[in-house]
Amino acid sequence: MELLAALNLEPIFQLTFVGLIVIAGPIVIAVLAFRGGDL
């Protein structure tokens, strides 16, 4: 548990948030394009 205590959680949350945006962005665009929606 010392390793977890030594880790700074803020950068981890930031990387996770950025990762979700990077993953969700193309998915949303693909769904809109698949449904024939215009951006």
UniProtKB/Swiss-Prot annotation:
The chain crosses the membrane at residues 12-32. One of its GO terms (cellular component) is photosystem II. Keywords: Membrane, Photosynthesis, Photosystem II, Thylakoid, Transmembrane, Transmembrane helix. Its main location: membrane. The keyword Metal-binding does not apply. GO terms for biological process: photosynthesis. It is found in: Cellular thylakoid membrane. The keyword Thylakoid applies. It is a single-pass membrane protein. It holds the Pfam family PSII_Ycf12. PSII is composed of 1 copy each of membrane proteins PsbA, PsbB, PsbC, PsbD, PsbE, PsbF, PsbH, PsbI, PsbJ, PsbK, PsbL, PsbM, PsbT, PsbX, PsbY, PsbZ, Psb30/Ycf12, peripheral proteins PsbO, CyanoQ (PsbQ), PsbU, PsbV and a large number of cofactors. It forms dimeric complexes. NCBIfam families: PRK13686.1. Belongs to the Psb30/Ycf12 family. A core subunit of photosystem II (PSII), probably helps stabilize the reaction center. This is Photosystem II reaction center protein Psb30. It comes from Crocosphaera subtropica (strain ATCC 51142 / BH68) (Cyanothece sp. (strain ATCC 51142)).
